[in-house]
Amino acid sequence: MFITRWLFSTNHKDIGTLYLLFGAWAGMVGTALSLLIRAELGQPGTLLGDDQIYNVIVTAHAFIMIFFMVMPIMIGGFGNWLVPLMIGAPDMAFPRMNNMSFWLLPPSFLLLLASSMVEAGAGTGWTVYPPLAGNLAHAGASVDLTIFSLHLAGISSILGAINFITTIINMKPPAMTQYQTPLFVWSVLVTAVLLLLSLPVLAAGITMLLTDRNLNTTFFDPAGGGDPILYQHLFWFFGHPEVYILILPGFGMISHIVTYYSGKKEPFGYMGMVWAMMSIGFLGFIVWAHHMFTVGMDVDTRAYFTSATMIIAIPTGVKVFSWLATLHGGNIKWSPAMLWALGFIFLFTVGGLTGMLLANSSLDIVLHDTYYVVAHFHYVLSMGAVFAIMGGFVHWFPLFSGYTLNLTWAKIHFIIMFVGVNLTFFPQHFLGLSGMPRRYSDYPDAYTMWNTVSSMGSFISLTAVMLMIFMIWEAFASKREVDVVELTPTNLEWLHGCPPPYHTFEEPAFVKV
């Protein structure tokens, strides 16, 4: 019974739970790796050997956090759990394909871990640029294992994307129009389209790299008429939409949380929010070369990518100000989930501002591959995506489990995490402006102070992670039942109680407008 329920599951709630558990476990591995990085950089001098092992840790940290933590939790966990409930569907459109999407991830994770264990490991950074990733600079199986791992994770995401698109377009009840769909459902739809369009390009790029390494092709080798810059174009055509894939479901969750805890019936500017997400999704595909300002593009090309990148700030600003307008005049409830949402809005905006600075091709020449870039994307990921995940988790935990967290501890947890991540990443702006480059295991002692501060912050974040594990244990141990939840048009997922029955919406639902 246990085997049939959890191994062969076709139930969206069970698969969502599997995704959440897998993402939490992978997140702890990724956090451990990030602490190794910060321990190495906590003071000048060497801690862990040479730069190769350091870069293997950096590479594994990036891949694990992106492909095995943020995406499984946001799209697999929250997406599977909430999308069918929010649109009144009995399950996902392809329940068995849903199961396969999940079970492709553990083998993929295993291959990634194997890549860091065999030979010298893949010390390429998550971008896996040739010629460093070629068979001379990285002889052995490591990079090949990484490529296979990415293939499996990519197939998993593509299948999941097909499933979500079909479910959202096809499985709404007849009375529900696309414009009565909750914003989280919209965000998952846009995310799924981005995945479906960008992942095949990554698959092509890394397959060409695989044949360059093993079958003597020369796609990326100038000696045979190839060009390593081609790989960068292919990778970033995937890589830039990918960062929007990581944040868009978070936008959807934040919209729900802000609306709910402001005591509002609906978010401010619903259609504006929908159009903003679709604009971000479209623009995300036409700005990729802003990651490549230093490879020597024409000045007019650089001008275009600078301008196009800055345009993305407009729909993003629409979303930020709509969240603030949703808060305005509301009866605000300072719950832990609301704290995460407010922290998200502030810190994501800070990360967006540093991104505006980096969008300038001339400034980026100076700041490229320094800690300024690291600070920028960790503000939008470590304090954007992660804060959205945490807010969504404490908000929907009663729905998933039927029990409530201790709200005092949840607030303390937020404060510790807030202090920790800011102490970790704010000083990295200073390091970057002072010219400290990324992906080095050591540094001149002029950079000691801010690196030490940054490493202290990372250990504060670690205590926050440990407190969260304890909070979850405490909730299941204490078994506090859930009070009745007020139903509004934006939180129909609570309709069936906490937790909902194994099968929901077995008959078509009707939407009263």
UniProtKB/Swiss-Prot annotation:
The protein's matches in InterPro entries, at most eight in alphabetical order, are given as:
Cyt_c_oxase-like_su1_dom, Cyt_c_oxase-like_su1_sf, Cyt_C_Oxase_1, Cyt_c_Oxase_su1_BS, Cyt_c_oxase_su1_dom
Q: Which residues lie on this side of the membrane: Mitochondrial intermembrane?
A: 41-50, 118-140, 213-227, 287-298, 358-370, 434-446
Q: What GO molecular function annotations does the UniProt record carry, in alphabetical order?
A: cytochrome-c oxidase activity; heme binding; metal ion binding
Q: Kindly list the positions annotated as binding Mg(2+).
A: 368-369
Q: Which cofactor does it need?
A: heme; Cu cation
Positions binding heme a3 in this chain are: 376
Q: Record-annotated residues binding Cu cation?
A: 240, 290-291
Q: Which residues bind Na(+)?
A: 40, 45, 441
Q: Which UniProt keywords apply?
A: Calcium, Copper, Electron transport, Heme, Iron, Magnesium, Membrane, Metal-binding, Mitochondrion, Mitochondrion inner membrane, Respiratory chain, Sodium, Translocase, Transmembrane, Transmembrane helix, Transport
Q: What is the location of the 1'-histidyl-3'-tyrosine (His-Tyr) cross-link?
A: 240-244
Cellular component (GO) terms are: mitochondrial inner membrane; respiratory chain complex IV
Annotated pathway, please?
A: Energy metabolism; oxidative phosphorylation
In this chain, Fe(II)-heme a is annotated as bound at: 61, 378
Its transmembrane ranges are 12-40, 51-86, 95-117, 141-170, 183-212, 228-261, 270-286, 299-327, 336-357, 371-400, 407-433, 447-478
In the Enzyme Commission scheme, what number(s) does this protein have? 7.1.1.9
User: Which residues make up the binding site for O2?
Assistant: 244
Which family, according to the similarity comment? Belongs to the heme-copper respiratory oxidase family.
Quote the function comment for this protein. Component of the cytochrome c oxidase, the last enzyme in the mitochondrial electron transport chain which drives oxidative phosphorylation. The respiratory chain contains 3 multisubunit complexes succinate dehydrogenase (complex II, CII), ubiquinol-cytochrome c oxidoreductase (cytochrome b-c1 complex, complex III, CIII) and cytochrome c oxidase (complex IV, CIV), that cooperate to transfer electrons derived from NADH and succinate to molecular oxygen, creating an electrochemical gradient over the inner membrane that drives transmembrane transport and the ATP synthase.
This chain belongs to which protein, by name? Cytochrome c oxidase subunit 1
